[in-house]
Amino acid sequence: MKQTQRHDAIIELVKKQGYVSTEELVEQFAVSPQTIRRDLNDLADQNRILRHHGGAALPSSSVNTSWHDRKATQTAEKERIARKVASQIPNGATLFIDIGTTPEAVAHALLDHENLRVVTNNLNVANTLMQKDDFRIILAGGELRSRDGGIIGEATLDFISQFRLDFGILGISGIDTDGSLLEFDYHEVRTKRAIIENSRHVMLVVDHSKFGRNAMVNMGSISLVNAVYTDVMPPAGVMQVIKDNNVQLELC
């Protein structure tokens, strides 16, 4: 493959996934790490990607990739994370399930459970869980985002704040190198904070593509959650925050 073709293919992968690691690209294109690093540096110089240590992300921090693209990426990783999270939730538990494709995978993994009571602002989660007659599904009111089935706004925030539940299943768009949790929508950030504040145990579910991914709204530190479920060891800066704050780390 010519360099220009490889550059175009790298851009497509970054657009599709939001973030790609150097290791992924080496395996994908069967070239040396040095070659990939040169490619990424060239693309960063052209402002076509944002260079991170160990990978690359989209240069924009204001627009998320589409729900359909996110749904189709990292599916095996999301399923492993979802199964691990589901194994930690007992029958009869109460829980929030957040917006995002990984929380949606968790919802699917919970279908073998019994007598769960779920509050969600994710229409896709409600549609998945409604097939269970013994589940009680409480869907938050608010403004429906047609692009991904998320429900947000002041009404959503007020609704979620009424509850105090056992678990909060939280997704996130990106995690900066200092452990900051990043999102694209300010209204969604406020809802996530409400889920954190009203959950006894918060489980952050993230695949490796979220590490180093850029987004414009800072929700706060990863230290806000009780446990992180992911498929790879987080970058050194994130790991330091996890260790310093005794956050549980589960590699799936």
Where are these regions (language model features)?
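Conserved phosphate- and dinucleotide-binding cores of soluble alpha/beta proteins
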Residues: 2-5, 9-12, 18-24, 30, ...
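HTH-adjacent hinge/linker in prokaryotic transcriptional regulators
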Residues: 2-30, 34-99, 107-115, 119, ...
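Conserved SAM/SAH-binding loop
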Residues: 103
